[in-house]
Design a protein with these regions (language model features):
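Protein-protein interaction/assembly regions in multi-subunit complexes
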Residues: 1-219
């Protein structure tokens, strides 16, 4: 049965509202929609955005001279647990399929932020203002942060490398670049319109982002 010939409304427009688009917020408009299908597509879109869009996150951390997360570092204000929590908040964009390592090497007095992270060009640091730790005069901190692309959530046990170095601290990871999704259905004269409001953890390339959504929805 040809649904279009039967008058069934198939979405023809899926675009971001350019007037409200920022690095951390976007409004996605989908129209036209068959009456009664707005909530169905909205819920499906919300699930896809929160669990199926690929992003990059930290999966492991190695700090020179530290063997486990319950350690402290001489000359550093934060203990290792606090440093891990701060490193988890870092956001990256990776252009590589596999794991990538980025490094930090500083000498105090210094406040370590995302801007201190050195990369090889295949990984972009998006949260350069993210605070990591404060280092006192005379102290030195060297860190290696492992970044990987993925989808959804991965626990630390899954990120732990079998037979890997004992001084690498595995971390749980939230890969999704989307932090929050709400949607609203508007009933127009002959069809429905859905607006999805997205809060993003990091910048997402708009064209690639839309392509990923369409592939998942088969629209």
């Amino acid at each position: 049965m040809d649904l279009v010939k039967k008058g069934f409304q198939i979405p023809k427009k899926i675009n971001f509202d350019v007037d409200s688009l920022t690095d951390s917020y976007g409004k996605l408009v989908v129209e036209p929609l068959e009456r009664g299908f707005g909530t169905t597509i909205g819920n499906s879109l919300r699930r896809i955005l929160l669990s199926s869009i690929e992003g990059a996150a930290v999966i492991g951390l190695r700090i020179e001279g530290v063997l486990h997360e319950f350690s402290s570092i001489k000359g550093v204000k934060e203990d290792v647990v606090d440093m891990i929590l701060n490193v988890k908040k870092l956001r990256f964009r990776s252009h590589s399929e596999g794991k990538k390592s980025v490094t930090v090497k500083v000498k105090g007095p210094h406040t370590i932020t995302g801007a201190d992270i050195q990369t090889d060009g295949t990984v972009d640091v998006l949260s350069k203002d993210q605070y990591i730790a404060s280092v006192d005069k005379g102290a030195t901190v060297e860190m290696e942060i492992t970044v990987k692309r993925g989808k959804g959530y991965a626990p630390a046990e899954q990120n732990k490398e079998e037979n890997g170095p004992i001084d690498v601290i595995a971390m749980d990871s939230v890969f999704s670049p989307i932090k929050k999704v709400n949607f609203m259905i508007a009933l127009l004269w002959r069809y429905g319109q859905m607006e999805a409001y997205l809060r993003r953890r990091q910048s997402v390339m708009q064209r690639q982002f839309l392509s990923n959504i369409l592939n998942c929805l088969y629209l």
